C-alpha cells in the first residue's frame, strides 16, 4: 500500500522532529501537549497490575487525547460490565506487536471473532445499547490497554492511511506493517531519533508522527460520532 509521505524513508528525521515536538513542547504557562501524558499516566494502561481492567485512570488518560468518555460508558466499563471487559482483556496479549502478527495468526488475534473484536464491540455498545463511544474513543481505549497491538484511529490519521471508515482499519494497519517494506524498523528509528525519554510503542510513534503531520497540513479533527 502507499504510505503517507511522513512515513517514508526519506522523512525519518522530519517524523522524529514531529514526535519530539509533541512530547516536549510547552505551551502558554508551561502547559504540555495533553496527549503527551496519555501513554504513561498513572504508570500506563498495560502495566501488570491493571493490564486486564479498564480503570478510571485509563479513561482519564483517553480524555487527554481530546475525546471525553460519556458518563454511562464510564459506569459500564469500570463497574457494571467490568467483568466482561476483564475477561476479554485476559485473552488479548500484552506483549505482542502488531507487526509480529503473522497472516495465519491474524484471524485469531484480530479477526471478527477474536477477543479484540469482541472488546471493540463492547466498547462501542454494538450488541447492547450505544453509550456514546465512537470508533476514535474505542481505539484510544484499546491503544491505552494494548499499545503494541492496537493503533489509534481518528479523523486525521485515518484519511492519511487511506481509511474511509474504521471497519477495515486493523487489517490495513497490519498490511502496512508486514509488507516487508521496512515500516517497523523506520518507526523504531523515528522514536530513537526523536530523543524522547518515554518508551512509547511503534504504533504510538506512528500515530503521533501521522497526527502531527496531518495537523501541519491543515487537517481538522472531527468529533467522534457514535455511529
State what each model feature region is.
Residues 139-144:
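Contiguous, well-ordered alpha-helical segments that form the cores/surfaces of helical PPI scaffolds
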